[in-house]
Amino acid sequence: MKKYIVPMKKLLFTALMISAFSACTTDTDTNENIVVDPVAVATCSDGIQNGDETGVDCGGSCSSCDIELEGTLSQNLTLDSENNYSLTGALIVPNGITLTIPAGVTIKATRGTSAYIAIAQGGKLNVYGTAQEPVIMTSGAADPQAGDWGGLVICGKAPTNVGVSATSEVADLTYGGTDINDNSGTIQYLRVEYTGATYTNEKEFNGVSLFGVGAGTIFQYVQSFEAGDDGIEFFGGTVNGNYLVSVGSGDDSIDFADGWNGSGSYWYITQGAKAGIEGSNNGDNGDATPVTQVSLSNISVVGPVSEGALYYKEGGGIFQIDNLFVAALDDQVIKVKSTDSEAQTRLNNGSLTITNLTGATDKASLSTGFDFTNYENISLSTEGLGAGAGAAYPEWAAGWSRQ
């Protein structure tokens, strides 16, 4: 709403005239009781647009006005750390378009399932945060909490075992294909907070969801904080994920499924409600191909958790894990459902290898829900530090992430 604006030059002129008028009066003036109304001075908290403001109490000499983000981009967009951004609905980055977010940008989302950021196949997201100035995507609520808004969804063209043209669980975007090296951009030093808005009990956002994202994508130094569902989840694809943090997820902390063929190093996981890591092949067909195959190293999982440091489910896959540190788990290192025959078969055939497992008391108590008999590929250690500092917060996570 446009309000009456008094230019600063006019304010100064008026003040000078009042001063001059006062100086010219004498004791004999008959108008000595004249009262001159004071000139209103614009402030940044008076609830109206005035002075040099470009909005109500914002812009000009005041703090920057919020810029609303919503809709499907039609051209490349680069944000500016000097601005305030409000995510008021779905922001879609379509094929051929790039969204670039430099260091220090914060995006605050309105509450509900309609507020999320989605990168479609062929679109790109470049997040150029730094350890000192991360990019933050968070809730705009005065009392933020898990599940406030959607989250970040990225869809690529890399292989999955659910088909070459699947539809994402949220945002209804196509993903999957045959391009192993598909590139969805560069994402580094990103913190995503209070995500996980719920559609139904079976459909809700994660902090970051990567659907068929390819190995040409850089995904590192990313944190999910207080997600209502999973923190970070890989749905197939070939992208690698390094230096990942999940704190306070409402479900699994880091999840991968649907034929993810990638690697991850330096993951710090704590305060998750269910599994530290959930690794599965395919919920409808445990033998689907390509089989989930991952190589992980330098991992810390700090409990308590209700479904183990690793929940090996729905056919599991071929997992190689080195330097796994676990704490506060009550020996819940590996969980397998008693009815998951494909996962059980793979486990006893040696498809899970864990070297330098620190924090477990003995091999016989590693698994819950299943009598695990093949321990040849699991070696215990007393010296591993997992993500770098054992159960403590790692040094590489300082500054840009939060505990």
Task: Locate each region found by the language model.
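Bacterial N-terminal signal peptides that target proteins for export
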Residues: K2-L12
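Catalytic metal-binding/acid-base residues of hydrolase active sites
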Residues: T106
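Extracellular beta-rich repeat passengers
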Residues: L69-D80, L87-P94, T98-L99, T110-G122, ...
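Bacterial Sec-dependent N-terminal signal peptides
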Residues: Y4, L16-G47, G55, G59, ...
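Glycine-rich loop(s) and the adjacent beta-strand/alpha-helix scaffold that form part
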Residues: E133-P134
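Disulfide-bonded cysteine-rich modules in secreted/extracellular proteins
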Residues: V41-N50, I67-Q75
